[in-house]
Amino acid sequence: KLVQFPELKLAYSEGQIGWLPYVLERADTVWQQHRAWGGVADLVPEPPSTYYYRQIYGCFFDDVYGLDNLEKVGVNNICFETDYPHSDSTWPHSKETAEKLMGHLPEDVIYKLMRGNAIEMLGLDFDK
């Protein structure tokens, strides 16, 4: 449906982000090698990662590996989440966790991860 609805946005919540680089690489490889089979080229005309970087967001609350691989995960494609009130979350220490995880990142990247990407994904009209 991402091909059919190019403005549709999806978010993978509660899944962290460290797995995304491998899945994107593998999906693109399989698409490249096998797209002529079974009409895949008609259904998915571009590499799968194209749709991810254009329309999909990953969410994380405690993923050092994912943040270490921001270039491949896509700095414009991820959002910090708290996962409150689940037991597998950083609450009530979400603020401290976010500061620990992202304190070394540039301010513009922190803004995107903490607020900017969510604003973009949801089509909101907020200023910094």
Report the location of each language-model feature.
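Iron-sulfur cluster-binding electron-transfer modules in prokaryotic oxidoreductases
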Residues: 1, 83
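Histidine/acidic residue-rich metal-binding segments in metalloenzymes
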Residues: 2-51, 64-76
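Mid-to-C-terminal alpha-helical segments outside catalytic/metal-binding sites
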Residues: 8, 18-19, 37, 57, ...
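Short beta-strand or tight-loop elements
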Residues: 54
